[in-house]
Amino acid sequence: MSAPDITRWMGIGLLGLPLYGVLSFFSSLDPQPDPNTHYGAWARFVTTDFYVLKHLFLSDLGLVLAIFGTFALGAYLATSRAGRMGLVAMAIAVFGSLLFLLVGGVATFSQPEQGQMHLQGIDGYREMPTILAQSAQMATMGVGMLLMLVGNVLLGVAVWRSGTLPRWSGALWVAGSALPVLGMLYALLPIDADATPATVPAGMVLLVVGGAWMAYSVLRRPSAQAAGVGAQPRVQ
């Protein structure tokens, strides 16, 4: 494959990053009620067709696109001044995203059944003892979120140091990646916080801007500058 084609495919792959931000932004606009404080409202919410379609085509699909975009970003950074950091960050971020996608898939297809049981008057589910599967799910989600945060922060730093991508697109990517995770940690506190705090859509906006900036920078750049010779630092 020629250098122009390789560069073009990298740029197309990078479009997965802003698309992930767009889909996740719309997914966060109508958050589900907190099951710990409003279980009945939560049960009604998760049994709607809207819930399943939103999770499947916004949250889950968005994360799949983020994985493709992360692979493209790591490949593009490989020949830059921050090539090693970019590849390590790519591996960490992708692994974390895959772990989180496992939990997202469970939520998409199992929570509607759980909510339906409550609406049908079958309340014994909430009184059942905790088993290994539930503990493993929470641990998987926690590890996934941590790896996503670490990997994406390192990706942003690699973009800043690369010399081949706009520095501030990396800074936006770091901020956009950190805000949703910090918001989700805040939501877990026992203070009756919103299940999806405002930091989540705010972070998604930053990811859209930062990801689109990176993709545009690659797609508009001459192929020779992006492959081989393209690893040369660009004047900021």
Describe these PLM feature segments.
Residues 1-236:
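Hydrophobic, aromatic-enriched alpha-helical segments typical of multi-pass transmembrane helices
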